Amino acid sequence: MERIGDAFIWPFRDPDWLSKVVIMGLILLIPIVGAIDGLGWMLVAIDRLRAGEEKLPPANFDYLGRGVVLFVVFLVYYLGLALVAAFLFVPAVVALSIQGNGSGNALLILIGFTLLSLAFAVALLGVLAIIFATPVIVLATDRGGVAAGLDLGGVLRNARKTPINTLIAGLMLIAAHFIGQLGPTAPAKT
């Protein structure tokens, strides 16, 4: 793809794009299995794009095998982030709950709120970092499996090779997440 706009146009070149996207959207509603199949479908779509094909892959459950590897990689990243945030969040909750009885210690309350704010900041920045690294993680996992996807040093090296492309892809993913969240909140036509 020479231009970013091609990324948005390519799926629409398939005459059956609407039915495929709707069916995959319905599959994605299934907890865990839908996400695994959706990740596999995305990897097959990337393969077709690289091969120069103009059609999206068929929408079905044939992609669970490819998707499970990528799902495991992202699960490890997000669980690691959750553990780091919990390491800060749990002491904050304990400190603040102790101060809820009677007269509180101002220093412990300050420490509790500081840890709480730090836990939120770590979680937010971590999620943004994972979103920005998603294209690199996907490509590394697709090429080398779980070990390559979890090789944080390799992922960061690849992200720094083309920082502009990584930044653009990350911003596109954030925009896609934002647009995806608008769907459930859009008012229904009557």
Give a label for each model feature:
Residues 1-10, 100-102, 113-121, 167:
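Phosphate-binding glycine-rich loops and adjacent basic patches that engage nucleotide phosphates
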Residues 28-50, 82, 108-149, 170, ...:
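Selective recognition of hydrophobic, aromatic-rich stretches within alpha-helical transmembrane segments
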Residues 66, 73-74, 78, 120, ...:
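Membrane-embedded alpha-helical bundles that form the substrate/pore pathway
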Residues 75-87, 91:
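Ordered, amphipathic secondary-structure segments that act as subunit-interaction surfaces
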Residues 88-107, 182-190:
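Hydrophobic alpha-helical transmembrane segments and immediately flanking/interface helices
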